């Protein structure tokens, strides 16, 4: 199972939010490239980068910082989400060196967009499903839809996406532990890999997710835990990927 460090960008800084609240942020660094280097040196094979400003504004805002990370680490797999609403934006990111582009809000608002994107950019499209209280949230998590996460996941899995990133918003940035039962239920319901996100606090929780690798959980994203030191990324990565 791949362990993936998260870099969340807001105003050019690397931050962590609590439960996706833009006003409840902690700044960990003002240098995204140096932050990426830190995780590369710790053995990261992939980075999860979110343009938080982009997610709220509906268009890429921190693309320059993301392009700089791509340029600095051409061999690193980078997956990017936040504010991606058009094929032109997807193309710009891929040309900059991004490996996977994550579609969230637009997947919910315009379901045909995902199918079209997988045709235009085969091998590059992931879908982010962000849930709160059993429903899918959009617009930087500010709006709750009526969609059931599993129903949505099954629909997009049929479109030929590379993976689904499943986030439990109530756990995100809280170090309260991932929602393993909901993540496993979703992974078992779809034939594509699922990457777990939200709530990881320690090594025990990483290994609890790894125990469900056979159910389709192929990766886990960690943010606050590795920045605050409750999880040693290098040690956890070695065990997760063993």
Curated annotation (Swiss-Prot):
UniProt xrefs under InterPro entries: Aldolase_TIM, His_biosynth, HisA_bact_arch, Isoase_HisA-like, Isoase_HisA-like_bact, RibuloseP-bd_barrel
Q: What is its main location?
A: cytoplasm
Q: For this entry, list what GO says about its biological process.
A: L-histidine biosynthetic process; L-tryptophan biosynthetic process
Pathway the protein acts in: Amino-acid biosynthesis; L-histidine biosynthesis; L-histidine from 5-phospho-alpha-D-ribose 1-diphosphate: step 4/9
Instruction: Give GO MF terms, alphabetically.
Output: 1-(5-phosphoribosyl)-5-[(5-phosphoribosylamino)methylideneamino]imidazole-4-carboxamide isomerase activity
Gene3D superfamilies noted in UniProt:
Aldolase class I (3.20.20.70)
Q: Which UniProt keywords apply?
A: Amino-acid biosynthesis, Cytoplasm, Histidine biosynthesis, Isomerase
**What Enzyme Commission number(s) apply to this enzyme?**
5.3.1.16
Q: Which reaction does it catalyse?
A: 1-(5-phospho-beta-D-ribosyl)-5-[(5-phospho-beta-D-ribosylamino)methylideneamino]imidazole-4-carboxamide = 5-[(5-phospho-1-deoxy-D-ribulos-1-ylimino)methylamino]-1-(5-phospho-beta-D-ribosyl)imidazole-4-carboxamide
Q: Is NADP given among the entry's keywords?
A: no
Pfam families in the record: His_biosynth
List GO terms (cellular component aspect): cytoplasm
The main enzyme category here is: isomerase
Q: Does the keyword Secreted apply?
A: no
Which residues act catalytically here? 8, 130
Q: Where in the cell is it found?
A: Cytoplasm
UniProt lists the family membership as follows:
Belongs to the HisA/HisF family.
Any idea what this protein is called? Answer: 1-(5-phosphoribosyl)-5-[(5-phosphoribosylamino)methylideneamino] imidazole-4-carboxamide isomerase
